[in-house]
Amino acid sequence: MDILKKSLFLVLFLGLVSLSICEEEKRENEDEEKQEDDEQSEMKRALWKTMLKKLGTVALHAGKAALGAAADTISQGAQ
């Protein structure tokens, strides 16, 4: 009976150690995935910022061109 108890305790101990190692690896994998997600979101944010900046520049030039065309039309109508 004593040998059976020792064997059972050994099996339980090894199982707990194995479970602990698996949990640690799982935690590390989750941390790596979170870090990758953070990096991707930063890249997306930078891309959107660049796109919006360029779009704003294009809109500004288009607005200036439209105002210039309107001013030309008004000045031609006044002549």
Curated annotation (Swiss-Prot):
Tissue expression profile of the protein: Expressed by the skin glands.
Pfam families given in the database record: DD_K, FSAP_sig_propep
Highest taxon of the lineage: Eukaryota
Cellular-component GO terms for this entry: extracellular region
Signal peptide: 1-22
Membrane-spanning parts: none
Biological process, per Gene Ontology: defense response to bacterium; innate immune response
Residue positions assigned to the propeptide: 23-45, 78-79
Main location: secreted
Cystine bridges: none
The keyword Cell cycle belongs to this UniProt entry's keyword annotation: no
Modified residues (Glutamine amide): Q76
Keyword set, alphabetical order: Amidation, Amphibian defense peptide, Antibiotic, Antimicrobial, Cleavage on pair of basic residues, Coiled coil, Immunity, Innate immunity, Secreted, Signal
Localization per Swiss-Prot or TrEMBL: Secreted
Record has Coiled coil as a keyword: yes
Primary role: Potent antimicrobial peptide with activity against bacteria, fungi and protozoa. Probably acts by disturbing membrane functions with its amphipathic structure.
Family: Belongs to the frog skin active peptide (FSAP) family. Dermaseptin subfamily.
Name of the protein this chain belongs to: Dermaseptin-S8
Phylogenetic classification of the source organism: Eukaryota, Metazoa, Chordata, Craniata, Vertebrata
